[in-house]
């Protein structure tokens, strides 16, 4: 049977470090959160020699029944930089590729209304003059993305179909 009343981590959850506690080039760290009911959530944080962070998530089901979870990710930017450039050669704001179509949305657009898109493949994020922060949904999994302003600028996605995790 499927248990849909599983406790999941929130922004208040306290994660613990498992194993190595120093993040360095090609030396990842693993954060864990145990829900106290037999399910352990893990986040592996990798840093490469070009300062690219890669965060992967995993769930261990130590219960006696299958569970279903809807994977999601979110990027939050608290405020727009004072020196935003908006040059035609460089986009600053929301960005994503949805089923091979590039979409760019300005901060002003998102402050006025949220933008929702669905796709089977792609990525989404927030970019600036010198950086990009992006999330990549599982390839081939239909997802809904939302760009919005609510207590900060947010780019997020959630898979439309749950992931089943067996014991």
PLM regions: where:
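Soluble non-transmembrane domains of integral membrane proteins
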Residues: 1-167
């Amino acid at each position: 049977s499927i248990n849909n009343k599983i406790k999941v981590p929130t922004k208040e959850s306290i994660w613990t470090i498992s194993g190595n506690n120093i993040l360095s080039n090609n030396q990842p760290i693993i954060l864990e959160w145990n829900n106290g009911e037999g399910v352990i959530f893990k986040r592996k944080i990798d840093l490469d020699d070009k300062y690219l962070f890669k965060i992967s998530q995993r769930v261990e089901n130590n219960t006696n029944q299958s569970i279903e979870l809807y994977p999601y990710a979110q990027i939050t930017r608290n405020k727009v930089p004072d020196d935003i450039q908006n040059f035609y050669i460089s986009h600053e704001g929301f960005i994503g590729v949805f089923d091979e179509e590039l979409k760019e949305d300005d901060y002003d657009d998102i402050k006025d209304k949220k933008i929702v898109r669905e796709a089977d493949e792609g990525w989404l994020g927030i970019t600036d003059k010198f950086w990009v922060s992006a999330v990549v949904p599982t390839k081939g999994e239909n997802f809904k993305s939302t760009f919005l302003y609510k207590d900060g600028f947010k780019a997020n996605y959630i898979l439309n179909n749950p992931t089943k995790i067996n014991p």
